Amino acid sequence: GLMAVKEIRFQELTSSPNLFKQIHDEMNVMEMLRHPNIVEYYGIEVHREKVYIFEEYCQGGSLTQLLEHGRIEDEIVLQVYALQMLDGLMYLHSQGVVHRDIKPDNILLDHMGVIKFVDFGAAKVLSRRSISTNASRRSSSFLQPGAVNAQGQSLQGTPMYMAPEVVKGETQGRENAMDIWSLGCVILECAKGTRPWHNLDNEWAIMFHIGMAKQTPALPDE
């Protein structure tokens, strides 16, 4: 079968020291996971100038690409996707893993249309041997290093999918809740065809509405 291959040059690793730790931590997380709704990790090969990471290939692309054609109008399809996302998330949390950057970019579809969570670059393992990273490699809208919440802690996640607990710095003991909020935002986007908080023009306005004004994204009229 086909495999997806990520290629990383050693030059990139040496110029960005955090990247090596980030990749190492992500591989540790992915090695733990085996579930129909999680992209499967096959292994890594280290060559002279490059590192190759092998993962399950998802022919259907991302949920983002699907939503470029508009909302998911068929309610049965939406229900199936929502149940698959919930199954995948329930499994992650049962393994003590919090994804921390759930959004349509990080949800893929295989050739059968089965939902798969991907990109564990921001994931955290809730255990004594905690591993965490600061950013998702593929997230252009991910907060830049240095962004902080109301408690002065580093923020992780993409603002429009970010839970109130994250903005207010109240995630201690409620880590799973942030993924559930983000997943709710994704399902809402599938139903509406527009991103949560799409009417706001910048990330700080979004975070104010989520954390300070205690507002939720608008629900569909129908």
What is each residue range found by the language model?
Residues 81-82:
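Activation segment signature within eukaryotic-like protein kinase domains
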Residues 43-44:
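A short, aromatic-enriched beta-strand patch in the conserved N-lobe beta-sheet
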Residues 147, 166-177:
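Conserved end of the kinase activation segment
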Residues 49-62, 66:
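Conserved short submotifs of the Hanks-type protein kinase catalytic core
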Residues 1-12:
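Glycine-rich ATP phosphate-binding loop
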